[in-house]
């Protein structure tokens, strides 16, 4: 429990660099089990609770807006497993999974998957600094989302503390091991436990049409915070505090090539290529598009991009695809 100036100042802002107020206190629980009691104490003291992981977010979710706030930093919740083959509800065959607490850095899960010959699909550019809890709260994704979706699509289950300082466990049923919007109905089991996490108080089942999780022509809809009432995901910590999760990991195809495509001329003529390339590769039965990253001319100038073409000028756009 930290009241010192350094701890409070270092929790004033996140990657946004916005500053409004210093938090009253910073809490760094040692174990997942401590979370519910900390939330209960903050509620009793009428402190606004701000969950924080790596602080890499660009939406200001970890920025205190009032002095009467408590930042709960999950950085010490670092327990995780190697790849484990588990039987998931509704599936006949065991599935490769990785368990991780909320404070585990994203890249560590990716490394654990790679050691066993698998791939962790949630790969934001902040993977070296962001944490698992934030990935769930933001429904994070990266270039592999083209093939396997965002955090929501790759979760087998997750655990969180509710605003009532009680425990909630959410489990995906009949997981399709792919993008959630490809299924007609996505089902989840919600189990509500008391403050000790041992006594089951009630349970319910959510059956949500898969199409509601994506916006037609857009994909992930960042404006949809309610997300059909599914707890924790994409809520930015507003409906509870994520403490741990179990992820599905995937096998990469045997052969992978990274292709760099440079586009010159008018950018408006090049942009439709993104959709055309995606549609073309999705129509091929033996080929998968594992990722597609778009870099515009401003980004290319900023990173000092070295043109592969002999034209001698910077491209208007570069696409990097994993095929």
Task: Enumerate the predicted regions with their spans.
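N-terminal flexible segment immediately upstream of the FAD-binding catalytic core
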Residues: 1-40, 57-97, 125, 248-249, ...
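Conserved hydrophobic/aromatic beta-strand scaffold that supports enzyme active sites
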Residues: 26, 71, 157, 258-260, ...
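Glycine-rich beta-strand-to-loop/alpha-helix junction loops that act as flexible
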Residues: 52-56
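FAD-binding subdomain of flavoenzyme oxidoreductases
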Residues: 79-89, 99-279
């Amino acid at each position: 429990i930290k009241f010192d100036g350094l701890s409070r100042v270092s929790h004033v802002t996140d990657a946004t660099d916005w500053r409004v107020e210093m938090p009253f206190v910073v809490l760094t629980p040692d174990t997942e089990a401590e979370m519910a009691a900390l939330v209960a104490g903050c509620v009793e003291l009428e402190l606004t609770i701000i969950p924080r992981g790596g602080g890499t977010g660009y939406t200001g979710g970890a920025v205190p807006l009032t002095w009467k706030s408590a930042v709960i930093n999950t950085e010490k919740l670092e327990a995780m497993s190697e790849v484990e083959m588990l039987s998931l509800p509704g599936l006949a065959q065991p599935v490769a999974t990785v368990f991780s607490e909320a404070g585990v850095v994203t890249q560590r899960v990716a490394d654990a998957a790679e050691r066993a010959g698998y791939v962790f699909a949630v790969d934001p550019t902040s993977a070296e600094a962001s944490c698992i809890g934030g990935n769930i709260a933001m429904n994070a994704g990266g270039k592999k989302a083209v093939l396997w979706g965002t955090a929501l699509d790759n979760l087998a289950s997750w655990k969180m503390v509710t605003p009532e300082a009680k425990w909630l466990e959410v489990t995906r049923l009949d997981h399709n091991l792919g993008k959630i919007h490809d299924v007609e109905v996505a089902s989840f089991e919600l189990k509500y436990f008391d403050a000790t996490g041992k006594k089951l108080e009630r349970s319910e089942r959510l059956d949500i049409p898969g199409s509601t999780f994506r916006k037609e022509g857009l994909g992930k809809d960042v404006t949809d915070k309610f997300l059909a009432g599914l707890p924790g995901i994409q809520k930015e910590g507003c409906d509870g505090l994520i403490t741990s999760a179990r992820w599905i990991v995937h096998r990469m195809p045997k052969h992978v090539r990274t292709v760099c495509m440079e586009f010159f001329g008018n950018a408006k003529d090049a942009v439709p290529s993104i959709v055309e390339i995606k549609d073309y590769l999705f129509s091929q039965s033996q080929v998968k598009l594992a990722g597609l990253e778009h870099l515009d001319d401003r980004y290319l100038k900023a990173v000092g991009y070295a043109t592969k073409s002999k034209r001698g000028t910077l491209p208007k756009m570069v696409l990097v695809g994993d095929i």
